[in-house]
Every structure is written in C-alpha cells, then in structure tokens.
Amino acid sequence: MRTETKEFFEYTKSLPFKDITHFWDIPYKEMLDEVKSVDERYWRRPFDADNDQIDRMKLDDSKSVNHYPGMKGDLIEAHGWKSLCFLNETGDSKDQITRFPPVFNTAGDYKETLKYFLNNRKWTNVSDFSPTLVKFFKEVISKYMHVGQIFVTRLESGGVITEHNDIPEDSKHLLDGEQVHMFDMLNTFNLCLNHVKSCYSVFDNKVMPAYDGCLRWTNVGKKHWVVNMNRKPQYQIIWQGIYKKQFRQLVMENK
C-alpha cells in the first residue's frame, strides 16, 4: 500500500464520524422538497424487512448486511424507519440490500471490486422523483468516488433505529486480522436534509452534530443508533462508495 493511501486509511480508522459539510455546495433544500413529495407506496423498511431479496439473490452474511436491526436478540426492533433506494444493483427500489465486497487482499481484488461497481449499479425507478439528487451525485460526488448505493431515509416521530453495527455477521472476524477492509473506518455518508430538535444520532457513544444540510462521514462499523423524539420526521441521504484519489487528497488536506 502506498504511503499516502496508508495514511488515509489510518486516519479514517481513528474517528467514529467527521463533519465534512464544507467539502461541497449541497442543494439539500431542493432535495428535501422533492423526496417529501414521493408517494407513500414507494417507501419501504430498510434491508429485507419487506421483500424477498435475500432468497432471490442468494445473499449471504459475508458481503451484505441483510437484517433489520432488532429482529434478533434482546433489543427492541427498529420502528418508524423507512427509506427510498435511489441507486442499487437491480434498478428496483424495493431491493434495499446492496452487496459491497469490502476486503482488498491485493490490488487485483480492488480492481475487481471497482469493475463490479461500475458494471452493476443502476438508478432505480424512484430516481425520477428527485432530479436534484441525481444531478448532485452525477456532477459533484462522482468526481470523488464510485458510489455503490444511495438511500433517502425517513425517521418518523417516535422512531427508533435500534443500536447495531453494519458489519456482516460472517465477516466480523476480519476486525482482528491484517487484511485491508472497509468495515472499521469512515465508510458511509450521512446527509441531514432537515434537522429536527431532539432527534439524536449516536455513533460509538458520541452524539453527532446535526443541523440543516450537514454532511457527516461515519464509521458504521461502530455501534450506532438514532431516536427521534420530535413530532416531525427527519430525512437523510445515506450513501457509500469507493474513494477516488481526489477524495483522499481532499480529506487529508482538511484533517
């Protein structure tokens, strides 16, 4: 691994989240207006809570997180949480799970993952509802990363996203190994379209900053949870991708 790339990975492993709102001019107000107008029938519970995608695509627990938080174990099941999938593998917004090969043993592994991303990503049937979102990702974000998935999420009044981490069950052993992977680093972008008072996002026992249009770069390998005690819903855009050199440079220049 090149020195500058190694320094980037080490830096991104040191934080549970980072506010990077100043990186780009984000048209969050326009995107909020557009997604709020989407008909309710398109909104679905994340992961495979309302679908047959696991069986249909023969997904396993090594390359994707498949299960709705709280469906197993002692914690309550997440509730009041729905999403719109704008970019995935199939082009069908009902498919809320995206495979993300996260382990790079060699440069060849990285190139194969990148090739897979470029050949297997489609804008879904809901993308027409937010031309502003599509334009922002095509004209701005694509210069800095190859985007793998895009969700708009809505957490209703009283909604809870149960504490969890987004590491596939069969890949958790990699945390103690030497392989290069993207599980325990800043790996997911979280854009708050509208901040509502008393809605808290907590990563690694730390409350994230929140204000209209704020963009948080987060490590979803850390335990995290969200609760909305406001009477109004909160909307966010969540995405992941493979970083280009331009993004790595931007990050290291703004440490």
Regions from the language model: what does each represent?
Residues 143-146, 181-185:
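A short catalytic or substrate-binding loop motif that flags glycine-/basic-rich loops and adjacent residues
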Residues 187-192, 215-217, 231-249:
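A short hydrophobic beta-strand segment most commonly corresponding to one strand
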Residues 147-150, 158-160, 186-190, 198, ...:
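Extracellular structured ligand-interaction cores
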Residues 152-182:
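Conserved short histidine dyad/triad with adjacent acidic residue
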Residues 1-144:
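Non-heme Fe(II)/2-oxoglutarate
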Residues 162-166, 173-175, 199-205, 212, ...:
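A short secondary-structure junction signal
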Residues 164, 199-202, 218-230:
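Short beta-strand His + acidic residue motifs that chelate non-heme Fe in jelly-roll/DSBH
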Residues 184-211:
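A short beta-strand-loop-beta hairpin characteristic of the jelly-roll/cupin
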